[in-house]
Amino acid sequence: MSDRGNVRIALKVDVDTHDGLARGVPAIAELLARCGVSASFFIACGPDRMGRRIARLLDPRFGAKLLRTRAVAVYGWRTLLSGTLLPSRPVATAFPDALRRLAAAGHEVAVHGYDHARWQDRLPRLSEAQVRAEVTRATTVLRGILGTDPRGFAAPGWRCTPASLAAVDAAGFAYRSDTRGSYPYLPAAAGQVFRAPEIPTTLPTLDEVYGRAARRPAELADYYVGLLRPDALNVHTIHAELEGGPYVGVLDTLLARLRRRACFVRLCDEAASLATTRLPICAVREGRVPGRAMPVALQGQESPARE
C-alpha cells in the first residue's frame, strides 16, 4: 500500500461464541470507537456448541492450529467444552442490548448462521429443509432483537452449498459474505446463478497467519498492510474471540497503521453500491487455504457475461 487514503477496507467481525459476544465484542467496539471506524458484525444467533468441534482434534491440521494460536487461552475451557461436557449457552439472545448498542453506534449487525458448530461441521450433510431452517431461525432471532431485517449473511466457517446459497436468496438478504476470494461477484453452483451478491473475505485471518507469517503485533500489522490492494475492496475478517481477546493488541496496531491511510466501509454500504453494478458470475468451489484445517468455499472461475 502506498498513497494515503487510496485503499478501501471493510472489517468483518465474526462472533461465534457466547464469550465472544460477552467479552470480545465490547473490546473491539471500544477500539473502533477510539479510531472512528465502523465495522460489520456477524453474529451467531443460536446456541454456542463449540465444544462439539473438539472431535476435530483427531485432524492433525486442526490440532496444530489450536496449539499455534493458543486456543485454550483464547477460548477458555468453558467454550471449548460448551455443548458437550458443559451445557451450551445462547449467543445473540444472551446479550440483546449489546447488539442494539452496536447498531446505535453505526455498526452493521448481521447474521452469522444459527448453530455455528453444526453449520461448519455438518452443512454438506444437512437437507435443504434443515439448511433453510438454520437461516430462517437466525434471521428471526436477529430481527426480534433489532426490530429490522438484517441485510447481510456470512456463512459459518466459509462453508456453503447450493442449498445454503438458495436459502440465503430465499430469506431476502441484500448480500452475502460466504467465501474467500478477490472481488464481489454473483455466485453460481449446480447450474444456478444466485441473486444476492457475494462480497468475499480477501485477506487471511489471524489464526491462519499467526506463527506462520509473524507473531508480534507490529510484524502482523506490517504483513497485512503489505497485502492490501489499492484497486479493490479489501475485506478483513477478524474474530471477536481472538482480536477481541488475547490478540487485541494486533488489531490495535493494525488500526493505528490504517486509520490515516485507508477508507473504512461497512459491507452493507458496499452492497448498496453494488446494486447498480453489473457483477461478474463466478463459480463457488470448495478448497483449502493455508493455515486453516477445514475446507472453505472459494471464489472460482469467472463465467462469460450474461446477455
Q: Model segments located where?
A:
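Catalytic alpha-helical scaffold of carbohydrate-active enzymes acting on polysaccharides/glycoconjugates
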Residues: 1-152, 157-197, 215-236, 243-307
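Positively charged, amphipathic and often flexible ligand-engagement surfaces
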Residues: 198-212
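Short, glycine-/Ser/Thr-/acidic-enriched flexible segments
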Residues: 204, 241-243
